[in-house]
Amino acid sequence: MHFLVNGEGKYELHLTMRTWKSEKIPVKSLAGTLSNLTGRRLIPGKEGAQLIGTDYTTVVFREGPSYYTMSGIARIGKGCSNISGDSFTMMDLPGGKRGVALSDGMGCGQAACRESTLVIELLEELLEAGFPEKTAIQMINTTLVCGREEIHYSTIDLTVFDLYTGECELIKAGASSTFIRRKDQIEHLTSTSLPIGVMNSLEIDSVKRQLTDGTYVIMLTDGVLDALPVGEQDFLLETIIKGTEIRNPKELARHIL
């Protein structure tokens, strides 16, 4: 048995074992016992054996995340159109992180949809390739500014959840407000940065927050706030979020929309 810390700073347990006689034991059933013994949530590696038999087998157990996310989405185009100029993605990132991104394309309809879809696809490719979040956004901005004669801007609203620590980072380029609901408290986070595709030099707003069990992070695009009376938008949306007892993320998204 070997107990070590891997390159990501997470614990690993390498265990070589076998059973007596013809008995076979599922690897998953051992994970709970080992977690109790070590005081850490250990999960078996996907690449190893799933059953322990009479032959010696080495199984790797890795420290698993302490948190998980549940997501819900609601969308509609301008004027109740079926075509929305907004695009989104949810992706697993290295190091036990989870990313959620929104992009609002310039204008509305098909053209805006194409712009925001392009931005989201580029973001997915760069993040999956291992680029840091802010570097990826800067690279997309350079692509949009230098590759076209006309200005076509899009917003980026990216939230990265660390499923091990419970911390999240909110990264915005021209994006709308984000609301964090903790029990009876609502935190309203805004951005003053420009969208991508406008200028070569891009300032990206970023802030980190510690989350706890049951916290809701509500991301939205400008169209939601624009549908509310000017001057009362933030207050009314906070009231809507705080006043509902809905707990299911998908139902909450529909309720807000």
How should each PLM-predicted stretch be described?
Residues 105-129, 211, 215-257:
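Active-site-proximal, acidic helix/loop segment immediately C-terminal to a metal-coordinating Asp/Glu
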Residues 1:
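Conserved catalytic-loop aspartate of Hanks-type protein kinases
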Residues 50-105, 111:
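N-terminal entry segment of metal-dependent catalytic domains or homologous docking segments
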Residues 5-11, 29-52, 56, 64, ...:
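Catalytic core of PPM/PP2C metal-dependent serine/threonine phosphatase domains
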Residues 81-97, 156, 188-229:
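Acidic loop->beta-strand submotif enriched in PP2C/PPM serine/threonine phosphatases
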Residues 15-23:
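A short interface-forming secondary-structure element
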Residues 15, 91, 131:
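N-terminal loops that bind phosphate or other acidic moieties
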Residues 169-198, 205-207, 213, 234, ...:
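PP2C/PPM-type serine/threonine phosphatase catalytic core
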